[in-house]
Amino acid sequence: IGVIVSDISNKFFADIARCIENHAYKHKYTVLFGSTDENPQKLENLVEVFRNKGIDGLIVVPCEGADEIIRDIARQNIPLVLLDREVPDLEVSSVVLNNRRAGYETTEALIRRGFTRIEMISYSMGLSNIREREEGYRRCMQAHEMGENAVIHHLRHDKFAKIEEIIREARQRRVEAFLFATNTLAGQGLSAIFRNGWRVPQDFAIACFDTNEAFDIYKTAIAYVRQPIERFGTEALDLLIKSIEQRDKPGSCTRIVLTPEIVESAPEEALRSAEEAAVKS
């Protein structure tokens, strides 16, 4: 089985990959891994390499600009399951998170703590999961009559230097909190906050997706989304094995939408953990 993610070193994907590998072993499958680094050419090359190695099926995290590559895999009747992200108007089995709900509820957690000037830092990529998180953020701000305060800053996935400029400018506008669209962005953002001598959550409160070991963001944040890693891995592999076994009898596709768990920290815990993280940085 071939598993292609955006970055195998990212904790979220690394943990899912491990779950897939463990589950595949029980079914007597060997797993090959690859990373695209959000580059569609790398995805295309990996698909070709894996095909030459005789893989039975693929689990793929689509990257921006790779829609036609994914469609071509499907046209060739290669058993395929999409993970974490989807391709518009393509009948392929997938396992995804309810990202709109996650974006909404993490924003709402900040609002419940009394924050009104909440902005989001996201990627400029048109990925389904990122856009849905942004939509959830916007909907929540509008539902709480804070739509005029809703601002989304977009960064390229390989251009993190701008995040410091964004946070400095936001400080001048008295922004109170940030929602980060990914754990990588949260790590970069927290580093920028500490470099400038600001404190979390006294100067900026944060909410984010997943955990980031470098700064214990999950303890520092007001709220974070804990994604069901085990279910991502097992559900994706189960769907793929089913597709492999029924390869000669194409059937309907299955879309599994997982429910996010929103974890909120106690105010005193967030404060204590942030102070510890600042010292470490």
Mark where each language-model region is.
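Amphipathic helical "hinge" segments at domain boundaries
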Residues: 1-49, 53-57, 135-138
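Flexible loop/hinge segments that line or gate small-molecule binding clefts
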Residues: 38, 60-105, 184, 210-222
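An alpha-beta-alpha
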Residues: 104-145, 250-267
